[in-house]
Amino acid sequence: MKLYLVTFLFFVIYKNKTFVDCVTKKQDVYLDDEFKSFTFFFASSPSANFLSRIVHSNEAKFTQIKNKTDIWNKTIDKAYSINQVSNNIMRVYISLLSLFLFPYFSYIGIFGHSRNKANLTLSSLLAYFALLVSFFLFNGILNIGFVTSLPLVVAVLIFILGVSDCEINFLYKYTRYIFCFIISKLIYDVVTYISKDGANIFDYGFSGHIYMNLLRGKYYIVLKLIHLIILSLISLIIIKICPKIFSNNHLKSPISITFDKYIISFLCSLPIATAISQVFYLLSKTINPIDPSIFFMIPSSINFSSTGTIFSLSIWILMSYLMTFLRNKVEADFNNILNKIPNNLPDFI
């Protein structure tokens, strides 16, 4: 009898050990790169502070927020699946991209006012906008190989098309629309940040409510498309509110021509500020909120209470002013040189 009992206990202990080992191995399988990427990003984000407050809060506080409409768990694992915080390839890629774009946009931002460089400048801005939108559409949907290659391919194609086939008036028209679209993104982030109740720093805003209430949050790509539509509508509203600046009927009006200089300086300063913010990110290990790979990402990476966001936006504003000042300085010097050329120079030659 004792022999049977010992045999039975040995069998139970062995099966339990085997079961535990199997569970451990299965858990290791599920800890893939995508889950690890999200885990590391979330642990380094301000949302971790919110989670900590929930864990250490009393039951009454937890009861108040646990019944809220929760759209995060359906999409947050995809939102930042490829990011600099947890992916070394992405960190090196964005750093090299920023290093390349910094001198290029500095040059066209200062010297791109001349007629022979206007097409190059506007095509470059259109290509960079295509890069931002492509990153937004592909990140969280495709793997890192496609996320790092396809946006560059799209941007290069748009640049070639703009330089070779597009008229200058067409480029100015869409440059103004790009400006309105980026302003719409900032307005959306500000309104979302102000209207939130503090339950989640990375808020989806109005696009998220439409996504969950009407479409029940089926596919993350649908949320991306809805967000682009919302930003496009806000952009059209801005154009309608300021027709003298953005309307197609006023492409050559004095106020539009003057404002175009500020628009170009503002847009050229974005990749410049991104490069400076990238250095700040690498040194301080914070999130670069204007990183092109997550610039349009929803939920937004811009958190107006974080040091990284305040630094990046401040640098962006400062670079916009500096680009405008240097651009006007170069243009004034160029006009002075032209005025000193004798009017009868062609006859003399």
Curated annotation (Swiss-Prot):
Keywords assigned: Cell membrane, Membrane, Signal, Transmembrane, Transmembrane helix
Biotechnological exploitation: Antibodies against G37/pbg37 partially reduce parasite transmission during the mosquito vector stage by preventing male gametocyte exflagellation and fertilization.
GO cellular component term, pick one: plasma membrane
Cystine bridges: none
Bilayer-spanning residue ranges: 92-112, 118-138, 141-161, 177-197, 219-239, 263-283, 306-326
Topology versus the membrane: Multi-pass membrane protein
Primary subcellular site in the record, as a coarse category: membrane
Superkingdom of origin: Eukaryota
GO biological process: male gamete generation
Topology Extracellular: residue spans: 19-91, 139-140, 198-218, 284-305
Cytoplasmic side: 113-117, 162-176, 240-262, 327-349
Location in or out of the cell: Cell membrane
Signal peptide (from-to): 1-18
Disruption-associated phenotype: Severe developmental defects in male gametocytogenesis leading to a reduction in the number of mature gametocytes. Impaired male gametocyte exflagellation. Female gametogenesis is normal. Defects in zygote-to-ookinete development. Severe reduction in the number of oocysts in the midgut of mosquitoes fed on mice infected with knockout parasites. Normal asexual development in host erythrocytes.
Function: Involved in the development of male gametocytes.
Protein name (database record): Sexual stage-specific protein G37
Native source organism of the sequence: Plasmodium berghei (strain Anka)
Lineage: Eukaryota, Sar, Alveolata, Apicomplexa, Aconoidasida
Gene giving rise to this polypeptide: G37
